Amino acid sequence: MLMLLRRRCRAWLEIRRLDKELAQSSGLPLELPQIVPNAWNEVVWRLPVPNHPDAFMTASNAAQSDFIVYVNGLAFYRAWLALGVEDSQACPLKQDMPKDRKYPSSAAHFAVGIDSPVPLADVSPTMILGHFAVCFTDGMTRSMWLLAHEVAVFPVLSRDEASAVMLAEHVGVAAPIQVSKLREQCRKI
């Protein structure tokens, strides 16, 4: 019980810190990840990673009807923390993310680079006690890796338009875009 109380307190303090940081950075422009041409004829993004080689992600796991949402890393982290510490998908604090048992596997996948881009996380919005939060169908550890490495903006996958719009409103940096339209744009690159 005491351990759970400590986790709640640490998460609450982190949310407060993030609220201040997000308020201070409000209105500052964030760059979208760059889409790069590739041999697979699929959408692949180059994500700048501070003090590390760039990371590469792909929409190869997306259906044509799915949507891509570019999320602000800090806002996304805050929304994931809002899920609560008791939830099975609870967000660890950034400093604890590398301790996750699957983290080394995600790190290894990101380390391969452009030759094997990492699939996007499949994310859904939810409300917890009146607060916006995010939950996952797939990609929690990939998201931990991005957050632990301070990636400012990254794409996530959303399976329907209403969810994509809600994600974009709360944690997004641009309007959502349907995968079919994005793939069409990529063919023109």
Swiss-Prot record:
Disulfide bonds: none annotated. It holds the Pfam family PFIN. Keywords: Plasmid. InterPro entries: FiwA/Osa (IPR035615), PFIN (IPR054044). Suppression of A.tumefaciens oncogenicity. This is Protein osa. It comes from Shigella flexneri. The gene is osa.
